[in-house]
């Protein structure tokens, strides 16, 4: 299967490789999932707000995610809230992501408003929606999705975390194809080594 977290890659598949679409993961990008979660679970359990009053703004590394946020099919939070009687069935349709800015856009906003991120407070109460993992941090890097998936697969199959979580061999900044073999000791089979072969394109 091909991952689907990059909307530019997904659009490329839709336009140029339509026959391969059945092999693309049906999972939305993390930003789109976050938008839907914000207007369902977080609206109720974190902010105690009507989901129609929640505005989700994504700050993204690329313009493809702005395009993704504008796709009319991404109204899952609205559908869920209607189906579960959280909002009336005749409520106007709303998107999972209301606004999307690139990191360059937000830097320009900061510049115009005279905000210096380096001079902002560094500590505050951490909210449930602000917690993240190392795998989540590398997700947006080239090869990061694969590295995050490998870390998780290793932990699940071996029953322990990788001693060195950096899997440099799947990072592909300068190559169009990167292949790697990751040996995993299978806990359920007494430590028998399973070689997981992966590729990043």
Could you describe each region identified by the protein language model?
Residues 1-201:
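Iron-sulfur-associated redox domains of electron-transfer enzymes in respiratory
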């Amino acid at each position: 299967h091909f991952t689907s977290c990059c909307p530019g890659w997904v659009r490329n598949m839709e336009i140029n490789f339509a026959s391969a679409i059945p092999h693309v993961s049906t999972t939305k990008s993390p930003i789109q999932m976050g938008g839907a979660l914000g207007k369902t679970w977080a609206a109720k359990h974190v902010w105690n707000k009507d989901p129609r009053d929640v505005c989700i703004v994504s700050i993204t590394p690329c313009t493809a995610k702005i395009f993704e946020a504008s796709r009319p099919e991404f109204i899952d939070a609205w559908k869920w809230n209607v189906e579960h009687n959280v909002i009336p069935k005749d409520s106007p349709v709303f998107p999972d992501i209301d606004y999307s800015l690139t990191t360059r856009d937000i830097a320009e906003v900061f510049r115009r408003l005279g905000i210096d991120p380096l001079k902002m407070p560094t500590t505050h109460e951490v909210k449930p929606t602000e917690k993240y993992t190392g795998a989540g941090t590398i997700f947006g890097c080239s090869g990061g999705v694969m590295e995050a998936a490998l870390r998780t697969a290793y932990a699940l199959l071996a029953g322990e975390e990788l001693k060195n979580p950096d899997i440099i061999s799947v990072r592909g900044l300068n190559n169009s194809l990167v292949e790697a073999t990751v040996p995993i000791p299978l806990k359920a089979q007494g430590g028998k080594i399973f070689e997981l072969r992966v590729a990043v394109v």
